[in-house]
Amino acid sequence: MSKPDVSKLNRGNIVEFIGGIFDRRGDEEYLGEPVTMAEHMLQGATIAEQNGQPEEIIVGALLHDIGHFTSEFGMFSMDDTEDRYHEEAGAEVLEQFFPSVITDCVRYHVAAKRYLCATKPEYFNRLSEASIHSLKLQGGPMDAEEVAEFEKNPNLKQIIAVRYLDEAGKRADMETPDYWHFAPMVQRMVDKHMGA
């Protein structure tokens, strides 16, 4: 199965394109966690669905780490001289197709970890060893100025919800449906943003 031309992505094929990423690349290791990339994202979405969360939270959890696959979107080059932050890369790709609440959940899920560690010290105890390591690389807990700025985001509640799902989606033995179970919901979010 070959990758489609990203310049031809539109509301009619973006959902299938993302599904292809899950199918082709989902078995990749998830940063030292006991789950694959697909399992991680599917677990977050499944937990959200089981808890009756709104579709925007479910889809935000499902797609929050899609930026790890920047090569699928033509955004990676061997000439790159700096990190392409996966959260920003993912949001950049999705923002033309999805409402801002979803792209904010993607763009700020790393910042939300830093925020929660600064404002709810007990949150740190939820973090896995790999997540603690990445927290250090991401700048550690936010300072007071960063917290105040972050709290201005109108989608703060949803971003925080996805962050909790991000941390919860690391269970080695959890059964989940596949991406295609969520695909109709993903399409509804695309249609909501782009006009049905």
Swiss-Prot record:
Keyword Oxidoreductase annotated: yes
Molecular-function GO terms, alphabetical: metal ion binding; oxidoreductase activity
InterPro entries: HD/PDEase_dom, HD_domain, OP_Dioxygenase
Protein keywords: Iron, Metal-binding, Oxidoreductase
Cofactor note: Binds 2 iron ions per subunit. During catalysis, TmpB uses a mixed-valent Fe(2+)/Fe(3+) cofactor.
Binding site for Fe cation 1: Y30, H40, H64, D65, D166
Main function: Involved in the degradation of the naturally occurring organophosphonate 2-(trimethylammonio)ethylphosphonate (TMAEP). Catalyzes the O(2)-dependent cleavage of (R)-1-hydroxy-2-(trimethylammonio)ethylphosphonate (OH-TMAEP) to yield glycine betaine and phosphate. Is highly specific for its N-trimethylated substrate.
UniProt name for this protein: [1-hydroxy-2-(trimethylamino)ethyl]phosphonate dioxygenase (glycine-betaine-forming)
Annotated organism of origin: Leisingera caerulea
Higher taxonomy: Bacteria, Pseudomonadati, Pseudomonadota, Alphaproteobacteria, Rhodobacterales
Gene: tmpB
